[in-house]
Amino acid sequence: MTVQTPPRARRRRSGRFAPYVYLAPAMTLFALFLALPIGYALYLSFRTVKVSGLGLGKGARTEVWAGFDNYARSLTDPDFIDSVIRVALYGLVLVPVMLGLALLFALLLDSKRTRGRGFSRVSIFLPYAVPAVIASLLWGFLYLPRVSPFYYVFDKIGWDAPDILSSQWVLFAIANIGLWGGVGFNMIVIYTALKAIPSELYEAARLDGATEVQIAWRIKIPVVTPSLILTFLFSMIATLQVFAEPMTLRPLTNTISSTWSPLMKVYRDAFTRDDIYSAAATSVIIALATFALSFGFLRLVQRRAFSQENS
Amino acid sequence: MRLHTGIRAAAIIAATTLLAAGCTSGDDTTSSSPTGGSTEKAEKVDLTFWTWAPGMDDVVKAWNDANPDIQVTVNKQDGGDPAVTKLLTAIKAGSGAPDLMQTEYQKIPTLVAADALADISGAVDSSIAGHFADGTWQSVTLGGDAVYGIPQDSGPMEFYYREDIFTKYKLDVPTTWAEYADVATKLHEADPKAYLGTFSATDAGWFTGLTQQAGASWWGINGDAWSVDIDSAASQKVASYWGDLVEKGVIDNKPMYTPEWNAALNDGTQAGWVSAIWAPGVLAGNAADTQGKWKMAPMPQWNAGDNATGNWGGSATSVTSQSKNVEAATKFATWMNTSQDAVNILVAKGGLYPADLPGQAEALSAPPAFFPNQPDFYTTATDIAKSVQPFTYGPNVNVAFSAYNDQFGKAAESKKASAFLTALTAMQKATVDDLLNSGFTVDE
Amino acid sequence: MTATLAPTKPPTVVRTTTGATGPSNKRSTLSTVVLLVGAAYCLLPVAWVLVASTKSAGELFTTFTFTPSTHLWDNVQDLSAYRGGLFWRWMANTALYAGVGALLSVIVSAMAGFGLAKFSFAGKKAIFNVILAGVLVPGVVLAIPQYLLLAQVGLTNTYWSVLLPSIISPYGIYLARIYAAASVPDDVLEAARTDGAGEARIFARIAVPMMVPGLVTVFLFQFVAIWNNYMLPYIMLGNDRLFPITVGLSGLLNQGASQPAMYTAVITGALLSIIPLIALFLLLQRYWQVDLAAGAVKA
């Protein structure tokens, strides 16, 4: 993609079109590979297939309008409602722990009093490089009592550890994989914000005798609050879309159903039941709910932490 | 499936731009020669074949070497359910499907219902039906005149056990399910860590085979209507039997095919496995060190003296409805599954139990390498294979199987025999609801 | 959803009245230990893959988890021999999808981010918000419609079918906008325009060099995103010679009931596939700065 160099005389006028030229590739790709498929999915969410007779042979299936049937079925499906509640719980467990640890690690990295910072920074960020499917496979091995080193140690010290994949604990097992993969990235985000704080700001406080904890609490954390809010927002969206971890762990246990998370239900409908229509309807519901939550959350925090940009 | 003109136009513009950028696309799925019939004999035909069975590269190589005019390319796929979705999506889109596809027997009605498979009855030799057992042949014809594939292998079920452990604890090989329960109890008492087997809620095909042995047939065709009989007396008998064993704790309740299960096969704490004829391959891969310690026996029976078994696994080779070379594809599929040369390779390299009856004798002359201690392995197996009970699959096996995973997962976790019956009822309901919702006529 | 956010001014320093002037550079054992525990937690599964990939198939399930063995080389050779070296082809494909895809994504995102940050024009806010809304739609849902649309133009089962949809990244555009706003001063652009430089020149010679650190982050971000994406290549590709590593390895794991899962191959493959990524991360270490919010101050 080349941007035409406008002749000097027309420079001012061309300035008006320049932003559109810059945006053209992104908008074209967006339209073709996101907007169009989304629109198509939206269309499919109002369709369904009807079968005649035994449904065998040519022409036995026809696609017809379904109105809001797919939506109504999704919203009244107890499996779907359960999955939403489950994922809400999952988010409540995962997001605060993940961001809390990310903040803690970032603060420790930022403190000159901590040793081994370079090594720790690399190590904690490392899991980000591991695809979720592979991460879940690795943790799966570490969760299964017979092949896990943890259970081996528990056994040796005579502690009867509960099965982490049993129904009471499986949520934590999945959240742990999310935590493992996500804490490093969020740590880097917060650490970047911390590094941007001019050091004079807290050197003065330090000279006045403020402790590291006081400096962190009163100066550093307020400054990184906008980053925290955005990491919270992105983590929330990722939580609602949790999929790869429970999906990969599922064959290892009885306790993860095929509709464990809302997106798994979408997957089951589209890929196991070959019902792309209700899968599309469910995903529209998920997208709208994500939108409402994100928007509501931003509204809530905007007054506190941000000033509205006027452009 | 047609899209709106606007959408298509936009997509075409995008594609043209991109192609103009000059990148070569990947291998085309199907041959470029659309000609059918006799003229194609002179031209070279390229066929693509989606499969996940082992040894396919070897058998295809043998074919390609002998048939320069019909070249087959193996594209190995993920063996899970999504492979079917992938094919169905390609069918909906009107392009992208391979010429040949490995089709598990239980998926054939679903694929036929989606018009994904070509009827090759016009391209096959009429004598071909004689190569297969009636039940096997019926699963590719669905009882009609059409032919939707050439059977490749089948999976008659047997009981596998660790001979050394049975000797150690002085256990007798169970011939009935009542004896199986006794042996399971004795073994678990003798070694509280050991189990004679596990109830696997992730393997719907396994449970289906068990109910098949007990006389169940989950679907049926009644004129123009489907019937669903998952929650039948026969299935209930099987469900409550296993539920009872799980509740007593003498049988494990964890899924098969996990690293945990592999470890148990290795250390002997899974001392038995109700499985199918292809088990030697799985055992060899998962617990190579136990070679020669296992033995195979007929399934325990519901009534002493009976002789019945079910099927777990097995698939056919089908030609898809998008193939432009149905005749060539059929020719290959027929050769692969009914010629002695190909069947020998399938057994030797793939460890399959061939569906082709005439080819069995030669191909199965030696026992599997993993069972050197049982020279008559295949002689016994061939007898057992004759006792597979009839069973009909319906057009929404995927729905029933996914309901099995969820419902029996809950039941196995609860360790309550009553929950196993509840699970069966829930499965029946989910399957019928899905059929009704799609507009099928269901005979209730 | 809007991301036109700007943080408030940093709060004024709270002066404490404690008299003691604490020694600020004293090492703290507690914080070191906490951080090292965190590092150990993150390294543990990686260490596990390392050890597990040295084991033969039998040892994997029979020996203690962290007892290393000597079969790493055998495992690598077995994996390399699998179907005529298909594994390495998957690695090369992954490098192509993630590398080229991320590079194109950076170019597209940088242009869009620059345009959004440095110009005011009709529909700017709407365009930005619409692009960001793309984050809300999960990829699992889009794979099938994307397939059906690409099939209309015959692009399924080609490199394009995976590459093209991977180029557009709402996150990338969001980040690029922030970096452009934060790192490219308006007066520099104005000066260049006064000197008669064309837009292409301004972008390529002035804006991009200033944005480089941020763009490297976008590259890493998108590289990992494409690397991680399983559903799109899974549904798009029928030809196993076009598969990326994730789809290929998952096929080795899901072999159907009558086949043992190839755990040793998958674990060795996982190890080999993580190594280049780790190398890339270490190489670009100094660019790890994901500034989600700060840049918006000047926007």
Where are these regions (language model features)?
Chain B
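Extracytoplasmic "Venus flytrap"/periplasmic binding protein-like
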Residues: 65-132, 167-175, 264, 268-272, ...
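Glycine-centered hinge/linker elements that transmit conformational signals in sensory
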Residues: 184-186, 225-255, 299
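Extracytoplasmic/periplasmic solute-binding protein
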Residues: 146-152, 157, 178-228, 234, ...
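Hinge/lid segment of periplasmic solute-binding proteins
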Residues: 105-157, 210-212, 295-297, 444
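A structural signal for short loop-to-beta-strand junctions that line the ligand-binding cleft
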Residues: 89, 97-99, 127-165, 306-310, ...
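C-terminal lobe and pocket-closing loops
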Residues: 278-290, 303-406, 442-444
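Short, low-complexity disordered leader/linker segments with a strong preference
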Residues: 1-46, 65, 432-444
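Conserved C-terminal helix/tail region of periplasmic/extracytoplasmic solute-binding proteins
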Residues: 167, 384-444
